[in-house]
From Swiss-Prot:
Binding locations of heme c 2: M174, C219, C222, H223
Segments on the Periplasmic face: 57-297
Protein name (database record): Cbb3-type cytochrome c oxidase subunit CcoP
Organism, as annotated: Rhodobacter capsulatus (Rhodopseudomonas capsulata)
Pfam family, one: Cytochrom_C
Pathway it works in: Energy metabolism; oxidative phosphorylation
Transmembrane segments: 36-56
Cellular location(s): Cell inner membrane
Family affiliation: Belongs to the CcoP / FixP family.
Membrane topology note: Single-pass membrane protein
Residues binding heme c 1: C121, C124, H125, M264
Length: 297
């Protein structure tokens, strides 16, 4: 007896065909579909229970559970602020020069000051305080405005040439000797050669000799007769090979031609009713930290 032939339902195709190869319209597995539906349900439920939809101008929907990571962070900040309240009050009440003699304050300022520095100062002065072009190193003892802790504190608090703070350190910008027609291009070239010479770099002897006289007449009033700089003017030492903007011919020429005048922001200034950028304790902590890095005077 012959067996009854079995018929197997063929899977339909999508109708797409490439070089004789057809795309089957195979149904997705049930487990996959149910998992997909479950994720949709979970997503809707999560968006209802937790903050999710930014339909308000300043915040998202709060969610039925009222969870807020921002509120959690604020609680943690408040908790640690309360823990540090006593030592911060002590720091504010202690004379700046006496901080280094107090082990508790030394420990606190090294940690808190480092945190402040990494948050607010490292963008310009570098993560290790080694400086960047246009932003001085805080490690080498080559200070434009002085490295005593009181000076560091004042400069952090009120900034340098900050137009917003009336108590900022106002020192004159370096003149633009070419733009302001103070020197001719040939004279600038001679001064550049002189600066190269006194900083220990190869220089044209003839031009350097002529540049020495021009320097004495136009530059010594800020940089000093010996070119070692004057803290009162914020003018750098030109003999030690430490350069804020660069000591090559092109950079020196540009500096003399167009001048320089860096700005450091005031970290205590605030608009009326606004909160200062840094608190008094934070300013003291970071000033003490910077002073302890090795370059403090």
């Amino acid at each position: 007896m012959s067996k009854k032939p079995t018929t197997k339902k063929e899977v339909q195709t999508t109708g797409h065909q490439w070089d004789g190869i057809e795309e089957l319209n195979t149904p997705l597995p049930r487990w996959w579909l149910w998992t997909f539906y479950a994720t949709i349900i979970w997503g809707v439920a999560y968006s209802i229970a937790m903050p999710a939809w930014p339909i308000f101008s300043d915040k998202a929907t709060p969610g039925l559970l009222g969870s807020s990571t921002r509120a959690d962070v604020e609680k943690d900040i408040a908790k640690f602020a309360e823990m540090n309240k006593a030592v911060e009050e002590k720091l504010v009440a202690t004379d700046l020069t006496a901080i280094a003699a107090d082990p508790e304050l030394v420990t606190y300022t090294r940690n808190a000051g480092a945190a402040v520095f990494r948050t607010w100062c490292a963008q310009c002065h570098g993560a290790g305080a080694g400086g960047n072009t246009g932003f001085p190193s805080l490690l080498d003892g080559d200070w434009l405005h002085g490295g005593a802790i009181e000076t560091i504190y004042t400069n952090v608090k009120h900034g340098i040439r900050d137009p917003l703070d009336p108590d900022t350190l106002l020192v004159a910008n370096m003149p633009a000797h070419l733009t302001d027609e103070l020197l001719e291009p040939a004279q600038i070239d001679e001064v550049v050669q002189y600066v190269l010479q006194i900083s220990g770099q190869p220089a044209d002897e003839v031009k350097a000799t002529a540049g020495q006289q021009i320097f004495a007449e136009n530059c010594a009033s800020c940089h000093g007769e010996d070119a070692k700089g004057l803290v009162e003017m914020g003018a750098p030492n030109l003999t030690d090979g430490i350069w804020l903007y660069g000591g090559d011919v092109a950079t020196l020429t540009s500096t003399i031609q167009y001048g320089r005048g860096g700005v450091m922001p005031s970290w205590s200034w605030a608009a009326d009713g606004a909160k200062p950028r840094l608190s008094e304790a934070q300013i003291r902590a970071v000033a003490s930290y910077v002073h302890s890095l090795g370059g403090g005077q």
